Amino acid sequence: DAVTVASHVRKDLDTLTAGEIESLRSAFLDIQQDHTYENIASFHGKPGLCQHEGHKVACCVHGMPTFPSWHRLYVEQVEEALLDHGSSVAVPYFDWISPIQKLPDLISKATYYNSREQRFDPNPFFSGKVAGEDAVTTRDPQPELFNNNYFYEQALYALEQDNFCDFEIQFEVLHNALHSWLGGHAKYSFSSLDYTAFDPVFFLHHANTDRLWAIWQELQRYRGLPYNEADCAINLMRKPLQPFQDKKLNPRNITNIYSRPADTFDYRNHFHYEYDTLELNHQTVPQLENLLKRRQEYGRVFAGFLIHNNGLSADVTVYVCVPSGPKGKNDCNHKAGVFSVLGGELEMPFTFDRLYKLQITDTIKQLGLKVNNAASYQLKVEIKAVPGTLLDPHILPDPSIIFEPGTKER
């Protein structure tokens, strides 16, 4: 499709120059001090600007196919504010697909050297004030966040999907893990749906989440499949998203005009931005598609979960149980995978319309089991809430075991 105007480029946070960082930080400090950022952050969680059955709820959309669209609008909202306040750069993205060695200085340092004033000042990206409460956001990075291929592996399976709704559920649940593992256990943290948007890292995270969607769109274009529209949930795609549709809450013209999910796909022409690259870990779209096809050649097994809201954030860990010792005894000490659920007191009720699939193939093979024989093992689920408390594993339906035969085995 012809691009009419893509007037700004979203860059990798790690590639910004010192001057670009200074400009971005100055603009962000402005929108913190005049409460613009707090007001935008209020769109997502607390205080609950939307209504559901007569109750205040968070406006953010989770657990449904319009999740990518809502958050594309949100990042665009922040980007417009930053550009209006003099930022020389668009919203950068925090690329967490590659294994994270350490958090970027922009978000991890409590202070920065203000070269204009020749002094150390508080870093506005380190935390954010929570609207309506005497609190600031905190982070408590967990060990799982660093030095592993989790995000890359999960991203590959999401990108493999050639149906928008199949892509969306894998994509959304993947994004939850960064919330959980960067936010940690505290109340006013990045891991709480109610408070996460007040943390400045939120829009950097969601710029990368949005870039992942843009990569999927390019893959779809390369595949000759729908990429600028959804081939599912058509009714939802026509319904404007709140509070972007509300001119009283959202005076921003562009996100108001394009508040229907169907209008968010064409981000270059409607929102006038593009990314510096749509490569994934230095792989072009054709290279990536070749890799995805190779990964589909051999059979894989998954634990399938029907996820719904529970009013809290949690990590869900899956273990494989195999017979051990006396009859009826099982050894369940074989961790097969983990995924995260993002929730909060004000979350809008949701139930995904299809199963989230967590791949457990490696563990099955390591145990010497056949991937196409689910009768030889069982699954055990452990659900741990963000504060660290164990929950009843039955708050989610028991998982299904799903075998997908390889393309070379059909």
UniProtKB/Swiss-Prot annotation:
One of its GO terms (molecular function) is oxygen carrier activity. There is a cross-link at residues 60-62 (2'-(S-cysteinyl)-histidine (Cys-His)). The keyword ATP-binding does not apply. Disulfide bonds join 50-59, 165-232, 321-332. Decamers of large identical subunits (450 kDa), each containing 8 globular oxygen-binding functional units. Hemocyanins are copper-containing oxygen carriers occurring freely dissolved in the hemolymph of many mollusks and arthropods. This is Hemocyanin, beta-C chain unit D.
